[in-house]
Design a protein with these regions (language model features):
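Carbohydrate transferase catalytic cores enriched for Leloir-type hexosyltransferases
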Residues: 1-380
Length: 380
C-alpha cells in the first residue's frame, strides 16, 4: 500500500504532535515495512528530528520545489499536496495533526484518514484566542466530516468528535498513542549523564509538558510547599509561556523557589535519564487529548499521579493515582503516600509497566493498519 502523510509536524515539531507523528511512522516502518510511506512537508524543518526515519528505504520525504516555495506552507499543503498525491498513485492519505488538505476532500480514489487529538478549544475556550477557536473548529470539523475515517487518541476525544462534529460512530476509532521504547530501557549511565549535564537535584518529582495555564503546574508548586519531605525538589521540563512567571512568583511566595527547577529546550537525548532519576511523576493537567508524558513515566518505572476531569485515567490506568486539579492538599497527600508506602510504590511501578504494554509500537501499528485496510475496502 502507498500511504501518504502530512509531515509538517514530523519535520518541525520537537514535542507534542511532532512526537506523535514520528512515533506513528516509526511503528509502521518497523512492523509494516511492506508499505511505501510518502511524507509531504512544506519545509525540511529540522532534519535532526527525522533523520533516522529517512534511513528506511520505504520512506520518502517530499518538500516544495524552489519555484513553489513562494506559495507558503498552507497554500502548498492545501493545493499542491492533493495533486502530488494523485501523481504518486497514493492509496491513502493520513492527516496526522487534526486536518486534511482542502483539495483532498474531492480527490478521487484516495482514501482519507485524519487523527483528531483533542477538542480542548471547545471544552476549555478560556485558554484560546477567539480567532483560533473559530479556525480550529472550522478546520477540524470539516476534516472530521470529510475523512473516510477519523482516528482519536482517547475514548474521550472519540465521544467529543461524535457528539460535537456529528460524525457517525462507526467512522471513528480510538488508536492510543505510544512512546519510544527507550523509556523502558533506561540505563544508569543515562541518569548520571542527565543529572550532571542539567545539574539536577539528588531527589525530585518530575513534570514534563509546556509551562502553560492548562497544564496546571501551579498545583504542583503548592503541593511541593506542603510535603512532609522537605528534601524533595520539583523538576519541570517543557516550553515556557508567560504563565511561567506566575509559577515563579508562587514558588517564591511559598518559600520553595530553591526547590523548583524549570528546564527549557532540553535535548531528547537527556529526557529518558531525567525520567529515570525521578521518584514520582506528577501531571495535574486540567485537560489533555491523551497524556504521552504519563506513558513515558510508566514505561520508565516511575509512579504516576495525574488529575481527574479529562482522559488521564485512560493513559495512567487503574493503579496510578489521581488528584482533583484544584486541590493542592490532596496532591501533596498523594505524593507523601507514594514516597512513604513502599508496597504501594512497588505495586504502582509493576502494574504500571504491565498496563502500558497496550501502547507498544507493534500494537499501534496493527491498529492503524486495520483502519487503513478498512478504508481501502470501500475503494475496491
Amino acid at each position: 500500500m502507498n500511504i501518504a502523510f502530512d509531515a509538517k509536524r514530523i519535520t518541525n515539531n520537537a514535542t507534542g504532535l511532532g512526537n506523535y507523528s514520528r512515533f506513528v511512522l516509526e511503528a509502521l516502518t518497523e512492523y509494516r515495512p511492506e508499505n511505501r510511506y510518502l511524507l509531504y512537508s512544506p519545509s525540511i524543518g529540522r532534519p535532526e528530528l527525522y533523520r533516522e526515519l529517512l534511513e528506511h528505504r520505504s520512506v520518502q520525504l517530499h518538500t516544495p520545489h524552489r519555484a513553489l516555495a513562494f506559495l507558503g506552507g498552507s497554500l502548498w499543503r492545501n493545493y499542491s499536496i492533493p495533486r502530488l498525491v494523485r501523481e504518486a498513485k497514493v492509496d491513502l492519505f493520513h492527516g496526522l495533526s487534526n486536518e486534511l488538505p482542502l483539495g483532498l476532500y474531492r480527490a478521487q480514489r484516495v482514501g482519507t484518514v485524519v487523527t483528531i487529538h483533542d477538542l480542548a478549544f471547545i471544552r476549555y475556550p478560556q485558554y484560546y484566542k477567539p480567532i483560533d477557536r473559530l479556525l480550529y473548529r472550522r478546520k477540524y470539523g470539516a476534516s472530521a466530516r470529510a475523512a473516510d475515517h477519523v482516528i482519536t487518541v482517547s475514548e474521550q476525544t472519540r465521544r467529543d468528535v461524535i457528539d460535537i462534529f456529528g460524525v457517525e460512530e462507526e467512522r471513528v476509532t480510538t488508536v492510543y498513542q505510544g512512546c519510544s521504547e527507550r523509556f523502558a530501557q533506561i540505563q544508569p549511565e543515562e541518569v548520571t549523564a542527565a543529572r550532571q549535564a542539567l545539574r539536577l537535584p539528588q531527589r525530585y518529582m518530575l513534570f514534563v509538558g509546556s509551562i502553560e495555564e492548562r497544564k496546571n503546574l501551579l498545583l504542583a508548586v503548592e503541593a511541593l510547599a506542603q510535603l512532609q519531605d522537605k528534601e524533595l525538589h520539583l523538576v519541570a521540563v517543557g516550553r515556557r509561556t508567560p504563565y511561567v512567571q506566575q509559577v515563579l512568583d508562587r514558588a517564591r511566595r511559598l518559600g520553595v523557589l530553591s526547590r523548583l527547577h524549570l528546564l527549557h529546550q532540553v535535548g531528547a537525548t537527556y529526557l529518558p535519564g531525567i525520567y529515570g532519576g525521578a521518584e514520582v511523576f506528577v501531571y495535574p493537567s486540567r485537560f489533555e487529548g491523551f497524556g504521552i508524558p504519563i506513558i513515558e513515566a510508566l514505561n520508565a518505572g516511575i509512579p504516576v499521579i495525574g488529575a481527574t476531569g479529562s482522559c488521564l485515567e485512560e493513559a495512567g490506568g487503574p493503579t496510578s493515582l489521581y488528584t482533583d486539579p484544584d486541590n493542592a492538599d490532596m496532591l501533596a497527600s498523594l505524593i507523601d503516600r507514594v514516597l512513604i508506602d513502599i508496597s504501594l510504590r512497588r505495586l504502582m511501578i509493576d502494574e504500571g509497566r504491565s498496563y502500558v504494554e497496550r501502547f507498544t509500537p507493534k500494537r499501534i501499528a496493527r491498529d492503524l493498519s486495520q483502519v487503513y485496510e478498512q478504508v481501502m475496502l470501500t475503494y475496491e
